[in-house]
């Protein structure tokens, strides 16, 4: 569910940027038809994205990769792609629950900017039929998340971070 200012905010940011790769915004959850603007998971994601509030950091690969090394705070439906600055294939499609995180990891290596707005510009529906919920149910999400952490960290550190990160899976329950 996109707010009326989403497109204007995205286009304004993209037009002001030197070499934008993606634009993303903060978001709210929609649970049982109700707008949820704050919960533990949203607060953690907002903290993770704090460095992206600083425009100078939006183009720094090291900063983007450090953020992503701790998890995936970018809500996929909030993303607008600047396709002329991206590879033809953004999503590899070999992950079921982490294909967006894998895409951000790949794009984070590229020269350009990850533009971020702190405005709540879209609502993400949380429901029991989602692919995320299904992937949690069959443990596929856990395996994929651990693999993603291993792209940034040695296995023993990835395992340690994953123990804390996996607690966020509970937030997908209604």
Predicted regions mapped to residue ranges:
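C-terminal, non-catalytic tails of nucleotide-sugar-dependent glycosyltransferases
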Residues: 50-62, 113-114, 137-174
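Short, solvent-exposed polar/charged micro-motifs at secondary-structure junctions
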Residues: 32-35, 126, 168-173
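Alpha-helix C-cap/termination motif
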Residues: 16-17, 110, 151-152
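Conserved donor NDP-sugar-binding/catalytic core segment of glycosyltransferases
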Residues: 5-44
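Conserved nucleotide-sugar donor-binding catalytic segment
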Residues: 25, 43-141
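Alpha-helical elements of Rossmann-like donor-binding domains used by nucleotide-donor carbohydrate transfer enzymes
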Residues: 1, 5, 9-13, 102-106, ...
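Conserved protein kinase catalytic core
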Residues: 3, 32, 131-133
């Amino acid at each position: 569910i996109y707010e009326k200012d989403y497109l204007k905010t995205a286009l304004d940011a993209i037009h002001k940027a030197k070499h934008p790769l993606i634009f993303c915004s903060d978001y709210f959850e929609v649970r049982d038809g109700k707008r949820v603007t704050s919960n533990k998971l949203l607060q953690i994601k907002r903290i993770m994205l704090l460095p992206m509030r600083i425009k100078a950091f939006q183009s720094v690969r090291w900063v983007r990769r450090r953020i992503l090394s701790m998890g995936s705070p970018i809500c996929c439906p909030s993303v607008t792609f600047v396709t002329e600055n991206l590879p033809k294939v953004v999503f590899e499609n070999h992950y079921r629950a982490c294909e967006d995180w894998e895409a951000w990891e790949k794009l984070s290596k590229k020269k350009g900017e990850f533009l971020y707005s702190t405005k709540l510009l879209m609502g993400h529906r949380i429901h029991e039929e989602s692919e995320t919920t299904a992937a949690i149910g069959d443990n596929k999400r856990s395996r994929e998340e651990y693999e993603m952490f291993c792209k940034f960290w040695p296995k023993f550190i990835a395992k340690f971070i994953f123990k804390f990160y996996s607690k966020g899976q509970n937030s997908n329950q209604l």
